[in-house]
Amino acid sequence: MPKKEIVQLKLEAPNPNLSPATKFGNLVFVAGQTGRHPVTGEVGKDIREQTRNVLEHIKLILAAAGTSMDNVLTVITHLTKREDLAAYNEEYAKYFPANKPARTTVTAMLNAPELLVEITVTACIPD
């Protein structure tokens, strides 16, 4: 049985409460990422900017794990406002133009009022 491996990024200080992602075999489980910029930590001004921030951060995490957005299998999205869904979908489509992963989108309250979106993904590392 493969051993669980923690994926860390060099650009951010490790969070003592969670890992950006874990690898198990050829699967990568990315923790929920929010609308903060992956380098500066600043929160995006609207749903479009926050969605881009999240997906760019996920892209970096997947690269550190040895895979890419092309290999995302599932996406779970939490939006704080249902009315943001159309704008979210437009930004999301830029990152997944074809071979879209299975996706669940729900409306939920997040841990900070300025955050509008949180995304969790599972990806694979191709053989």
PLM features: residue spans?
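N-terminal presequence-like segments and the immediate start of the first folded domain
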Residues: 1-56, 60-73, 79-127
